[in-house]
From Swiss-Prot:
InterPro entries according to UniProt: 2-comp_sensor_kinase, HAMP_dom, HATPase_C_sf, His_kinase_dom, HisK_dim/P_dom, HisK_dim/P_sf
Protein's UniProt name: Sensor protein VanSB
GO CC annotation terms, alphabetical: plasma membrane
Compartments (UniProt record): Cell membrane
Name of the coding gene: vanSB
Span of domain HAMP: 157-208
Organism of this sequence: Enterococcus faecalis (strain ATCC 700802 / V583)
Alphabetical keyword list: Antibiotic resistance, ATP-binding, Cell membrane, Cell wall biogenesis/degradation, Kinase, Membrane, Nucleotide-binding, Phosphoprotein, Transferase, Transmembrane, Transmembrane helix, Two-component regulatory system
Record PTM Phosphohistidine, positions in chain: 233
Amino acid sequence: MERKGIFIKVFSYTIIVLLLLVGVTATLFAQQFVSYFRAMEAQQTVKSYQPLVELIQNSDRLDMQEVAGLFHYNNQSFEFYIEDKEGSVLYATPNADTSNSVRPDFLYVVHRDDNISIVAQSKAGVGLLYQGLTIRGIVMIAIMVVFSLLCAYIFARQMTTPIKALADSANKMANLKEVPPPLERKDELGALAHDMHSMYIRLKETIARLEDEIAREHELEETQRYFFAAASHELKTPIAAVSVLLEGMLENIGDYKDHSKYLRECIKMMDRQGKTISEILELVSLNDGRIVPIAEPLDIGRTVAELLPDFQTLAEANNQRFVTDIPAGQIVLSDPKLIQKALSNVILNAVQNTPQGGEVRIWSEPGAEKYRLSVLNMGVHIDDTALSKLFIPFYRIDQARSRKSGRSGLGLAIVQKTLDAMSLQYALENTSDGVLFWLDLPPTSTL
């Protein structure tokens, strides 16, 4: 069903009210005007016939016609007649209408007693005047009707224009289109438009946040799907290798008859498998937010010094050396266990990727409300496309070499989740001297 516009409705209601008001007003004024006109005409007529009344009162019936004729001769514009109490006409002017067809509104009894009545008729000029005034009244009513139509149109236009603009804006909002801010108004419609636009802005922000959340959820699902697929692959390969070794030993095939040798290989594989599973569980805990950082004062130099002995044997085996430059007294606020875990993985990754005879440099320097701790493995360059993927779980630049050396590919992923849990700034980037990892730590004075 086609909807009627609000303009037509407001205009119709307004014009109906105005026309009713004009009609009632015109009716009241017409009644008042007629009553006033009749009263004035009656008063004037009685006054005009007063000399005749006096003459007739002082005359007998025989002289009445002569007196009346003389009065009419002197006032030829007057039309009247005289009748007795039985209704018989005693005298009538030539143009007087004594029949009952004359409207009572145009008859005036200017005198009445026990014997006679003098009945005067309205003058023709008075009738024409009455007719002219009536026409003028009709014209005035027509003008008032036209004026009412104009006022109704202006009023309806003024009332419906902001409402239609508000409806158009609401339609655009429903379709998520751009809506400009409303014009300033000092009435309720202005307040409504402002509130609707504010609600629209908040709705857009909420939708944007929801879209971001959906995108993050989708990204998280993709990451989890990749993580579980990669984890399954990482766990399946060693298990398959151990199964082959065990079957060979059970069947006493070839070299597999040397059970002690291959059992030790199986134990090594299972140890690496256990380490990988532990790292997977740790990464899952970090990803689920079950590990809550507890910030404590931490000496950077002492923390690094306590970690380096764990990697000294590996570095010496590759003829590598550590160079540290961390001034004493650099105290930061961080979770000791989490920061040690992250630094352990960073240093291990640096040692594993530094060429034989190379150098791993570790230093810190103060900055604006922070201490920057840096780890640089000299003489190394990583392709930029691979550099951005190093924090992805199970990603390895050299798959064969990394698997042979026992690397799980989870070290930097654990570093990323750990530092993100502590809301710390960090980066891994290429420099002219090698690959640099830096980490910003807040000093104790900032918290």
